[in-house]
Amino acid sequence: MDPRRIWRVALLLLVAGANLQAEERIRLLVQNSPLAGFRYHAGAALWRELRVGDALELAREPDNPHDANAIAVRWRGYKLGYVPRSENAALAWGLDRGTPLRARISALTEHPNPARRVRFEVFVE
């Protein structure tokens, strides 16, 4: 599906829910992904401190020499890795337009393959 179409639907739902009370806000799950590059950043050193549900920060890196759509995933200021290249275009498009995105850890698995250790969810609120 075209990333722009996904974002149009998400933004339409947000506008429709703009008049709801704070406790009735709509939170739309737009992506659930594995964390890319976990073994190359601070993830291994922080593994024991990470918890399912912990908030994550998504930080665009438009000048990244390897991927113009790069989005770093940070936990408490530490870079854990990236949104996978194959899944970052729609999120980059949204972040570049100021869409309020929230992310959190959705799963932690002690797997020998670091690419399978952390999954995260991204929401539009």
Residue ranges and their predicted role:
Residues 2-125:
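Conserved active-site motif detector
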